[in-house]
Amino acid sequence: MLEIQNLKAGVEGKAILKGVNLSINAGEVHAIMGPNGSGKSTLAQLLAGREGYNISGGSVSYDGQDLLELSPEERVCEGFFLAFQYPVEIPGVNTTYFLRAAVNALREHRGEAELSAVDFLKLMREKIQLLELDESLLKRS
């Protein structure tokens, strides 16, 4: 599903990734661990499509397509994105509204019908119960 072969990349003339190889099959979960400066964040940002990195070699394919050729927006629709650990609050936009917009954008990309507010709230409640989260999450900004 995700295949990284001999990926070499850097920023501002400094080599950071020096031949990364990684294969992740559908349904697998992997953790990328290592000391500070080993390239974990660089790899994540490259996969998400952040600008400013120079790729000097290697390839990244996802589900048979060249991930490096996709725009950041296209990568998001394929499931590659970075989320902030402590996101900035956007005044007037609550978590439920934000998540519904994100889910519906993904559904549109897949050719699926948009979820109504009622259907999305039902889905959110199911997932909140499944994950044993507090329902106050629905009202959080």
Protein language model features and the residues they cover:
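ABC nucleotide-binding domain signature
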Residues: 31, 76-85, 125
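The feature captures the beta-strand-to-loop junction immediately N-terminal to the Walker
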Residues: 33-35
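ABC-family P-loop ATPase nucleotide-binding domains
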Residues: 88-141
